[in-house]
């Protein structure tokens, strides 16, 4: 018990920087889209990736792509790559993977969501507020899929 408390006390996590890595907004059917009744179909794709920049320093990128169609036509497509540089040390491999795959994207998401909302409004479309994402559940699902694939390869 004392060892676990000591290990937790040694763990270190810090946000060094949050930055916008890439952004794109396309409204291919403007201004014709503004003349149509607004009944949007919103599709959200997200992905994360991370890489080590130096000892205990990691870049995490959260990529959000929002495609909104109205009827059959694309109203707009918005892609944001929100980046962060984080320092993390004295973590076990599983803890570090969870930190980079769930905790850090959870920190980045509000920044990416705000950028998307701002771009959509600047395109003069109705405001788009993305619902919160449970990155912990997505990460656990990813781990389960990896385990199933590993079992399938062994069989």
Curated annotation (Swiss-Prot):
Task: Say if the entry is tagged with keyword Transmembrane helix.
Answer: no
For this protein, the record's NCBIfam families field holds:
PRK05751.1-4, secB
A cellular component term from Gene Ontology for this protein is: cytoplasm
**Official protein name in the record:** Protein-export protein SecB
Pfam families per UniProt: SecB
Question: Do you know which InterPro entries this protein is assigned to?
Answer: SecB, SecB-like_sf
Quick one: a GO biological-process term for this protein?
protein transport
What binding partners and quaternary form does the record give? Homotetramer, a dimer of dimers. One homotetramer interacts with 1 SecA dimer.
Q: Which GO terms describe its molecular function?
A: unfolded protein binding
What exactly does this protein do?
One of the proteins required for the normal export of preproteins out of the cell cytoplasm. It is a molecular chaperone that binds to a subset of precursor proteins, maintaining them in a translocation-competent state. It also specifically binds to its receptor SecA.
The record lists the organism as: Vibrio atlanticus (strain LGP32)
HAMAP family noted in UniProt: SecB
Membrane spanning residue stretches: none
The answer, when asked if Transport is one of the entry's keywords, is: yes
Q: Which UniProt keywords apply?
A: Chaperone, Cytoplasm, Protein transport, Translocation, Transport
Which family is it part of? Belongs to the SecB family.
Q: What is the lineage of its organism?
A: Bacteria, Pseudomonadati, Pseudomonadota, Gammaproteobacteria, Vibrionales
Instruction: State its location(s).
Output: Cytoplasm
């Amino acid at each position: 018990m004392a060892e676990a408390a000591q290990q937790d006390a040694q763990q270190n996590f810090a946000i060094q920087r949050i930055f916008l890595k890439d952004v794109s907004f396309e409204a291919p059917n403007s201004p014709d889209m503004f003349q149509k009744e607004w009944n949007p179909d919103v599709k959200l794709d997200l992905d994360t990736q991370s890489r080590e920049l130096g000892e205990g320093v990691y870049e995490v990128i959260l990529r959000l792509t929002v495609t909104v169609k109205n009827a059959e036509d694309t109203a707009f497509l918005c892609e944001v790559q929100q980046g962060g540089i984080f320092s993390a040390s004295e973590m076990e491999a599983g803890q570090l993977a969870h930190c980079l795959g769930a905790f850090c994207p959870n920190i980045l998401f509000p920044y990416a969501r705000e950028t998307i909302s701002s771009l959509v409004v600047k395109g003069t479309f109705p405001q788009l507020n993305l619902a919160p994402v449970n990155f912990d559940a997505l990460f656990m699902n990813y781990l389960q899929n990896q385990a199933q694939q590993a079992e399938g390869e062994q069989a």
